[in-house]
Amino acid sequence: MIPGEYDIQPGDIELNAGRRTLALSVANTGDRPIQVGSHYHFFEVNDALAFDRPATRGMRLNIAAGTAVRFEPGQSREVELVEIGGGRRVYGFAGRVMGDL
């Protein structure tokens, strides 16, 4: 192997395999763009985003790590969420959970 070389197995990599997902419509009711990162607890996003908030407790966007989704003012779009893994504890963000899910 050459230093810095990647040794990638053939085939596709499936993100978040085996985790529960949820598709829902989200609308930006505000007057400014809102961007949500890949690992942000969706239940706690900006209140100007309108959606079924209770259904999203313990979930995040089902997108690649380090990426984000941007919601322009007045825009509605479908997103897919995935369960938060690991210890299923949420701290910080908007402070709405601060503990176990």
UniProtKB/Swiss-Prot annotation:
Please give the family membership noted in the entry. Answer: Belongs to the urease beta subunit family.
Q: Please report the name of this protein according to its UniProt entry.
A: Urease subunit beta
Reactions it catalyzes: urea + 2 H2O + H(+) = hydrogencarbonate + 2 NH4(+)
**Subunit annotation:** Heterotrimer of UreA (gamma), UreB (beta) and UreC (alpha) subunits. Three heterotrimers associate to form the active enzyme.
Q: Name one GO molecular function term.
A: urease activity
Q: Pfam families of this UniProt entry?
A: Urease_beta
**What EC designation does it have?**
3.5.1.5
Which InterPro entries does the annotation name?
A: Urease_beta-like, Urease_betasu_sf, Urease_subunit
Lineage, broadest ranks: Bacteria, Pseudomonadati, Pseudomonadota, Gammaproteobacteria, Pseudomonadales
Please classify the protein's predominant subcellular localization into one broad category. cytoplasm
What keywords sit in the KW lines?
A: Cytoplasm, Hydrolase
Q: Which Gene Ontology cellular component terms are annotated?
A: urease complex
What are the BP-aspect GO terms? urea catabolic process
Pathway it works in: Nitrogen metabolism; urea degradation; CO(2) and NH(3) from urea (urease route): step 1/1
Q: Which PANTHER family match?
A: UREASE (PTHR33569:SF1)
Where does it live in the cell?
Cytoplasm
**SUPFAM superfamilies in UniProt:** Urease, beta-subunit
